[in-house]
Amino acid sequence: MKREIVYFKSDGLKLKGQLFIPEKTPCPVLCLCHGMPRKGLANPNDRGYAGLAERFVNAGFLTVTFNFRGSGASEGNFDIRGWTRDLKAVLDHIYKMKRADQGKIALLGFSAGAAVSIYTAAQDRRISSVIACACPDTSRLAKNRELAQTVIADYRSMGVIKDDNFPPSLQEWMQGFDEIYSDKWIDKLAPRPIFIIHGDQDDVVSPTSAFNLYKRAGDPKEILVVKGAGHRLRISEQAMDHALAWLKSRTFRD
């Protein structure tokens, strides 16, 4: 396995990512999409998305991790519509890579990253399959102005929103969540497969979101509710074991 630092350009912003490359290429690709930044989640034993990426690269997937705008070492301010453009920029880069099997590009998204993955896959046929973990089907930020202002203030203190004059329009920033966090996109993935995973103890996104999304999705589709798991499914061994097994079955079946 090799690791390479890579930068993507989106709306003039520089986004930082990493490629985890198996020995044998060209090969299928998995792009990991993180969720909205949150406070107080540091865990010295958590190897983060890099640790998760190694799990998939060892199974033969060229695995891509990156930070959406406003997050980690990437430039810009947090904006959910902007995240969809960021993912498109990453996919554009992947599609040009000689080490990638362009016919097998999968997304594994978590929470907001799952919503962005579904939205993007609904409009981008280059994506062959999606795994959506702890995915919301609606957002309180789309309707609650006071909550949106609180989140923006928190993100400003965290450095996720860096510019004092951002967002230029609070209403448009909120409307982005109404557009992206929606069950109206998921049926457009068919006949490409989707796997929905949710924890039954998720206190951030209700498990009812998973069932609603599953109901709206076209075939082929699968759903898994992990007993005892909370919102952070990335650190659930059971959830990620099932995600890897499902992805392998969908990717290497032929």
Name each region found by the language model.
Residues 51-73:
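Conserved alpha/beta-hydrolase
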Residues 89-151:
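Primarily recognizes the serine-hydrolase "nucleophile elbow" in alpha/beta-hydrolase
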Residues 23-55:
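Short, surface-exposed "cap/lid" segments of acyl-processing enzymes
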Residues 1-25:
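N-terminal cap/lid segment of alpha/beta-hydrolase-fold proteins
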